[in-house]
């Protein structure tokens, strides 16, 4: 195989179907899709032809594949320039890539160079498609690109499709002017410079306007020529307007300047500077706590001993809300105001919702006599409450019993349960671990790794990162395969066999596809034998089918 062909094969657009490149996911990337379809057509035509006895066709196919790669790269550069939302108003070739809900219309281009005479491509002529033989020689297409999609809104613009000159009968292609990319780059650079200079002017302004005046290094002119930019977000002030209508902060040197008496934080008349409503006022806080307790009829709730020793059920909300209110009061002094207390009392004493029902039950418990507390079974609580001390003793005994039970359960726990403690949170963790170990064991069982010490060393270093989910299995394959040094080598591997390998790879399962795409890099980069690569791909496919069963 020729050296010129071999260096292009590893990165052909055909491989983009195997590897999930982000730029091939979106439907808006029409040029990449067209190029990939073109490469598929070329390979299909190649398989249909008998190229073993026709070496000249093989050379033509390789040249066409190289062209498809350069064409796709050029189209991506064009899309990157056209998708830039800010273009010059008077640019020689102005285009927008707009997308509608109806979908993206595909545009099929004619063959450019050295394609087979059996393939026909439709040629767009005045809205009609005519089959044209693609045996024509392609001109120099360094500056010829696929043009962005035109929608119904841009009918007044000149169509960028290929057309036939009726007067001369020759095919002319409207090419993308070289000055377009230069003008777009120049406009973007000027825009970034103007923005940076404008920011510096704002920081160091003494008496200038905060808005974007006419002396702002041309940002106003450039903003008028933008297509997609909404300039309403910028506050523009007319420099020629009457000074009395300008804002007051315009004359300030800076809002946070230390010499500005109006912006000094130490001269506040009210707010944080007041000492009457200091946060350290404990009388107001104590009064507020008592008032809140009285609002829900908890007379004895404020005693610290009972509050600390009170064994709260899991679903209680009384003590939780009280702690929340105390924490809130410590950070928000305004919450002690009468209006805030009235709102909270209204919230705590309202008649709807599960919170009000719980408060009613709590007030019932604390306000009834000892004989009446035995009727708690009607509310769902099947235990007897004595006085406060008995209740605290019962709570502590329950705590002790719970701790003893936890300690006994930990002592009687099996070691296997400790190792698999995290599996209870994720039921699929054990299954995923077993599956991953199956893949790793499959890699270790390959003769390729057993006879290659460098691959084994790389695998040992990579496995910890793989178990920590820092890399996926395809990355493990790429790292391990790239570390190989000794493997079956075959020089001048024929192109048809490589194409058949890629065609078979595209039909495989995800695991086998990842293995095949990783091993194919060794085929093109280090002349790995295609037979050996096909054998590894076959073993990966067998393992995947067994795993599915």
From Swiss-Prot:
Residues 89-111, 126-184, 202-225, 298-361, 381-430 are annotated as: Disordered. One of its GO terms (cellular component) is cytoplasm. The gene is tas3. This is RNA-induced transcriptional silencing complex protein tas3. Its main location: nucleus. Keywords: Cell cycle, Chromosome partition, Cytoplasm, Cytoskeleton, Nucleus, RNA-mediated gene silencing. GO terms for biological process: chromosome segregation; heterochromatin formation; pericentric heterochromatin formation; silent mating-type cassette heterochromatin formation; siRNA-mediated pericentric heterochromatin formation. InterPro entries: Tas3_C. Ago1, chp1 and tas3 interact to form the core of the RNA-induced transcriptional silencing (RITS) complex. The RITS complex interacts with the RDRC complex via interaction between ago1 and hrr1. Clr4 has a role in mediating this interaction. The keyword Nucleus applies. It is found in: Nucleus; Cytoplasm, Cytoskeleton, Microtubule organizing center, Spindle pole body. Residues 328-361, 403-416 have a biased composition (Basic and acidic residues). The keyword Cell cycle applies.
